[in-house]
Curated annotation (Swiss-Prot):
Protein name: Inward rectifier potassium channel 4
Residues annotated as transmembrane: 56-80, 148-169
Reactions listed under catalytic activity: K(+)(in) = K(+)(out)
Natural source organism: Mesocricetus auratus (Golden hamster)
Motif range (PDZ-binding): 442-444
Membrane topology field: Multi-pass membrane protein
Keyword Glycoprotein: no
This protein's encoding gene: KCNJ4
Amino acid sequence: MHGHNRNGQAHVPRRKRRNRFVKKNGQCNVYFANLSNKSQRYMADIFTTCVDTRWRYMLMLFSAAFLVSWLFFGLLFWCIAFFHGDLEASPSVPAAGAPGGNGGAAPAAPKPCIMHVNGFLGAFLFSVETQTTIGYGFRCVTEECPLAVIAVVVQSIVGCVIDSFMIGTIMAKMARPKKRAQTLLFSHHAVISVRDGKLCLMWRVGNLRKSHIVEAHVRAQLIKPYMTQEGEYLPLDQRDLNVGYDIGLDRIFLVSPIIIVHEIDEDSPLYGMGKEELESEDFEIVVILEGMVEATAMTTQARSSYLASEILWGHRFEPVVFEEKSHYKVDYSRFHKTYEVAGTPCCSARELQESKITVLPAPPPPRSAFCYENELALMSQEEEEMEEEAAAAAAVAAGLGLEAGPKEEAGIIRMLEFGSHLDLERMQGTLPLDNISYRRESAI
């Protein structure tokens, strides 16, 4: 039997845990080794590789791509200017009429391929200005070298390709619904208890955002080692747990937290498992919640898992939804809390069915262990009745011109109750007797 600590959490007996196949945060605990041509396969799907990689690596990759393209075309422009002779220092020709001049016209300087490029730094700056379309207007390509014109066109195309790829990758990485799963919540424990006379496995899911998950549906699989009849060992044999596929109960309207129910019947892998077997079993139940994000219409998936040690036998979840005057309130402080249910059978569902045991309602427990749903319902009903009586007393007091204090309201309430009893007696005196009773009296 599991006890409770001060925080309301159930104590789980310690025993050796198996390695999780799916972690509680949804990550798969799988490592791939000895993959042939891994780099080539990942580079063949470079877009998915960039989307799946971390932000820092992606930004480093695109920064390196820009820098390499600038350096490459800067070197290309420098080579064009070098072989055209634009980098050679032109001799200083004295102006006409200057001392030592011949008074004649100065020889015309050859027209360069790229204006104002006198070294590699100038060529690199021209490459950056061309690819980023800054357009300072100081350096430009002339008609002297067609090769330089072709290089400018090619660099413009390459720059557009890099920009488009970077923007598309960043947008796809930001819009993917992977982070939406962080606001979908699974309970820390699953429970097994009786519901409608049958043993059921239950866990709770919740949505922390007000935006809905469209077409939300759940799935569950039990994973455990399995030995076939031929002696083949399957370390991770997967078997489905029916959560209402046939009748549509797997599709949920996830506005408030919902308890997912798996009925342990003949087709369930848990059919022959009782409380003692559960404590010694080695399995993992993977639960999956899928749906479309309302804002982007993209499919998201949230995952979690429960080991055998995280399933509480004979427990139920505390309620989290409370009806108030104008709305419903969801208290997420109770989301993971459970309470023990007296009278839950410890046998398996098979034994329960074979022995034809009828699960009778347990005798009323003490106030401290009273069912939370019934207690809250009674408290809510009593509060509503008290509010109605107080409103009626205030109305009567206002009609009589009295100040309705606490004592006056109590007296008026007693008067109303006494008056209702008198009215009931008067009505009973004026009502005619039943004809059937007349005939029976005459027969007597």
